[in-house]
Amino acid sequence: MASEQLMSPASGGGRYFQMQPEQFPSMVSSLFSFAPAPTQETNRIFEELPKAVIVSVSRPDAGDISPVLLSYTIECQYKQFKWQLVKKASQVFYLHFALKKRAFIEEIHEKQEQVKEWLQNLGIGDHPPVVQDEDADEVPLHQDESAKNRDVPSSAALPVIRPLGRQQSISVRGKHAMQEYLNHFLGNLDIVNSREVCRFLEVSMLSFSPEYGPKLKEDYIMVKHLPKFSKSDDDSNRCCGCCWFCCCNDNWQKVWGVLKPGFLALLEDPFDAKLLDIIVFDVLPVSNGNDGVDISLAVELKDHNPLRHAFKVTSGNRSIRIRAKNSAKVKDWVASINDAALRPPEGWCHPHRFGSYAPPRGLTDDGSQAQWFVDGGAAFAAIAAAIENAKSEIFICGWWVCPELYLRRPFDPHTSSRLDNLLENKAKQGVQIYILIYKEVALALKINSVYSKRRLLGIHENVRVLRYPDHFSSGVYLWSHHEKLVIVDNQVCFIGGLDLCFGRYDTFEHKVGDNPSVTWPGKDYYNPRESEPNTWEDALKDELERKKHPRMPWHDVHCALWGPPCRDVARHFVQRWNYAKRNKAPYEDSIPLLMPQHHMVIPHYMGRQEESDIESKKEEDSIRGIRRDDSFSSRSSLQDIPLLLPHEPVDQDGSSGGHKENGTNNRNGPFSFRKSKIEPVDGDTPMRGFVDDRNGLDLPVAKRGSNAIDSEWWETQDHDYQVGSPDETGQVGPRTSCRCQIIRSVSQWSAGTSQVEESIHSAYRSLIDKAEHFIYIENQFFISGLSGDDTVKNRVLEALYKRILRAHNEKKIFRVVVVIPLLPGFQGGIDDSGAASVRAIMHWQYRTIYRGHNSILTNLYNTIGVKAHDYISFYGLRAYGKLSEDGPVATSQVYVHSKIMIVDDRAALIGSANINDRSLLGSRDSEIGVLIEDTELVDSRMAGKPWKAGKFSSSLRLSLWSEHLGLRTGEIDQIIDPVSDSTYKEIWMATAKTNTMIYQDVFSCVPNDLIHSRMAFRQSLSYWKEKLGHTTIDLGIAPEKLESYHNGDIKRSDPMDRLKAIKGHLVSFPLDFMCKEDLRPVFNESEYYASPQVFH
């Protein structure tokens, strides 16, 4: 039905005409065509009222356009954050104008809604009329009484704008007036959270997130490198004066800059926590290389246009041009950024000890703690428990990641602990998961990372995966990303030699068999010496015939870190993730940029109770959409990693797969920790620190109070595992307070840094040089060079050589013990045509150890004679067992994959870096590690004298040695002193020699010192194949009966009877194996045409 409207034509007399209903809405909207009111910010920055105090008032410069206006220094405080603002009275005027404008528009908007409702009640509008209940109260004109409270009277602002009075009293009156005005809007939470006040106070959604550090500078700036994004139509927030003169082209966009101690973040809006871009501060070059002038992170730029004011921020391989409103703001930004980048203790743009990006931690009571894990079983169980306790985010970085990996064994009852199931469960709970994996060259490696990425991405939308590098675009074909990291909530991280992939799970028993399958399902029953699977997609399908081939046991060491070192590791991950994202997915919104977290020290005016209160609000903050884990607290939300030990040290289902009847069967599990009095390091402890003297780090370490958390342990995680203490297991160490420093190998290609970092290499050399008595090394490779070696560049070998010569000249006992794999862990027999890579690596290792003028033993023999073995010796590991109940007895090397060095039982270096040029030079493979220096000492002995050993380092060595030597419970005291003859010669060397001889008698396995050429190897292989019918690629199958001659008679015996005399897994490294062969690739092998750098 049409509506009618009265019209008054010029001819006089009224007449009516009909108007269609659809015309009314447009008419109504045209009557109230005011600018829409800004919506009330749903994300509130302030949860409680901040405080602000005027600390000083300054008179304007003589050249000021308005000399009567004053500048005010305002000190603000919100919770544990303090910051200062310098505001002119004119800025107060603009703030007041903006608040009045907001109030006016809100009022108009409210009345517009009321008129619309009134018209609808008359049946004129689009919607049916609102029928009001007769009993309902009359709707007041102003339904929101808080709107009146949000208004700031103009009378409050006027004294601030122009304080009246005599010249002498203007400053006093102005200070009083400004304080009164601040009190008006600081007393109302709605006004404080308005966009106008938040901009005036220079705050945003990131300002008060404690995990990102203290509040520094924030403001609107202009950038042009970002793609176009949606912008507000409100021009009142324009930051650049030149905008009014149209000097900025369309490529420049206004963003909100947030400066934190470790980065500069760019946001679209203060109320939006989503990153548009981030500049993570990194070590700057010392000079520009031309005139020796130091390079700054931020520098002011000169522009021929006087209306443009800009500066440049350079970090890593990135350089961003930024504009500000005026020259004063540019100078303020430049000074603030450079100050933040060099602010102690981090000083991210200043290289620290060893040239590392990260500073030494634990010099004070900052919560730095570490815990070691020996072999994959212990480490994987701890990682699983940490993932299960994740609350906000998980970072995973690996050379190889297998989604189907079981982190707890036996695998059948632990399906929930499979990696993909663990991650899926946490992703469904809202935990954000970021996985960074190495993109291999498919022709060289068979790890199939594209399959891993596809499987991981299919878990849940909260799982993000990046593979890097893209080889063609980056030009990187020879080098890899080799780090192995798991970081949970920035609270605990795991670092070391273990990838989350097949073949790595193992225990101290190092079983060679598993038939029927109980512990190692499908392709996890892994022996790369025998065969590398062509595909990993059918993970539960066996690659090896279990009745014929042993698995290759895997020995590794991993470490958990808490406190500032954990966040330093996370910072490395963030740096690598952001660099990969910019190169591979710059415009993909589903792959976000990440922000590094910061160790924030509680200010002096706040106590431990305040810290606890902040921590209790973590859950509330996560609901608001910003992860505010209390990472500045020295108390982690995660408790100690559980000490996990299988209930049964023998076969878990009664099968005999991998059964050992040897000395290690009598161990009753790993050794028990020796109970010793623990003493913190104080200023009087005669401990030569493993630090550079110029850094002044030999400072007393603050003693930890009674609230130390060494005794806190997680509850049982699963019925098949029990929680123990450090006195009950030898595969998990005590959680220990210590000094820590994160070290790494990175360069431009791997992390986008402006210069090469080789701090792992520097740390190795420094530790060796400062060692007093003893160095213990376990590593996958041992390839290094002496001074003058132009081919192998790293100088770990040179440092060892010099230290040994010094000990010899000083006539002091000094021991270096090196444990490495017996053979490279690559496919192919020693004589196979396709095993040139195996032989090439053997060449470089023997070149380092014993062959040629560049080897350490050759040089030591030439200098000190046969006593060289008193100073340095080399070893490997080997295991044996039955492949099945009625199967043959087999042996395999225990593949040493750990990357550790322990010095004087007081310092330990653990990480992913091998001892070769690939890992140590920084410009090749990317690596990460941690140097741990003990601050908690225990009574021990060294060279026959009392010695204060470190709790972390000594317990790790004792665990490793008790496993390698097969020591029973109660025998640990025999190896307390690692350098005495009774330990080094009578136990360590004697055990290795005896075990090696027994393995030779039973198996004649390779490598050994009796086979000097490929021809001799062919003859031995042919003999054993003819005698046994089948053997392994390294002659690892024993005959059913051993034959020996006694008084002319042949005596036959069970090989297991002979093998019972073996203790542990330690064997001598065969120095004479293949000594008559040149093991380098030859012209008809493809490896001949590859760069030798690939192998060393």
Swiss-Prot record:
Belongs to the phospholipase D family. PXPH-PLD subfamily. The lineage of its organism: Eukaryota, Viridiplantae, Streptophyta, Embryophyta, Tracheophyta. Its EC number is 3.1.4.4. InterPro entries: PH-like_dom_sf, PH_domain, PLD-like_dom, PLipase_D/transphosphatidylase, PLipase_D_euk, PLipase_D_fam. Its main location: cytoplasm. Residues 131-152, 607-691 are annotated as: Disordered. PANTHER family: PHOSPHOLIPASE, PHOSPHOLIPASE D. Does not require Ca(2+) or any other cation for activity. It comes from Arabidopsis thaliana (Mouse-ear cress). GO terms for molecular function: phospholipase D activity. Keywords: Acetylation, Cytoplasmic vesicle, Hydrolase, Lipid degradation, Lipid metabolism, Repeat. Disruption phenotype: No visible phenotype when grown under normal conditions. No effect on root hair patterning or root hair growth. No effect on the concentration of phospholipids and galactolipids in phosphorus-starved roots. Pldzeta1 and pldzeta2 double mutants show a smaller decrease in phosphatidylcholine and a smaller increase in digalactosyldiacylglycerol in phosphorus-starved roots. Pldzeta1 and pldzeta2 double mutants show reduced primary root elongation and increased lateral root elongation under low-phosphate conditions. The active site is at H482, K484, D489, H897, K899, D904. It comes from the Eukaryota. Calcium-independent and PIP2-dependent. This is Phospholipase D zeta 1. The keyword Secreted does not apply. One of its GO terms (cellular component) is cytoplasmic vesicle. Residues 477-504, 892-919 form the PLD phosphodiesterase domain.
